Amino acid sequence: RSSDLFGSLVKQYHLKQTADRADWLIGEGLLAEGINGKGLRSMSEPGTAYDDPLLGKDPQPAHMKDFIKTREDNGGVHLNSGIPNRAFYLAATAIGGYAWEKAGYAWYDTVCDRNLAQDADFDAFAKLTIAHGEKRSGSDVGAAIKQAWEQVGVL
């Protein structure tokens, strides 16, 4: 989810954290006392944010092989967001440094791109992030982004 990604970047910027120092958690501290979990979602390890008898287990997949096909949640847009979230985490940590400086710009440029269709699938989105990463930051960044999407099974 773009909101997860950009929220995480704002937090990292505020804390002056490099990609390898960030916790990559969304909603940490929001779970009630006694709930077994560290947050609502994990960008680094989707599906591991919580596992509790009351809440159940974090359902987010980290790889396309576990993609959830459903009519609920607008086709699983929130459930399956663990896949692109993990791709961003992998790209940002592979590139190194501050995630907002290179990987973040590639994703930002992608969501601002008029060529990004409203109903774009992960494949189309991934290809645009690679192109924007290369355009703004060079072929090494584009290659790291491509490898991240390959690692989560999108490409």
Q: How does the language model describe each region?
A:
Residues 1-155:
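Zinc-dependent metallohydrolase catalytic domains
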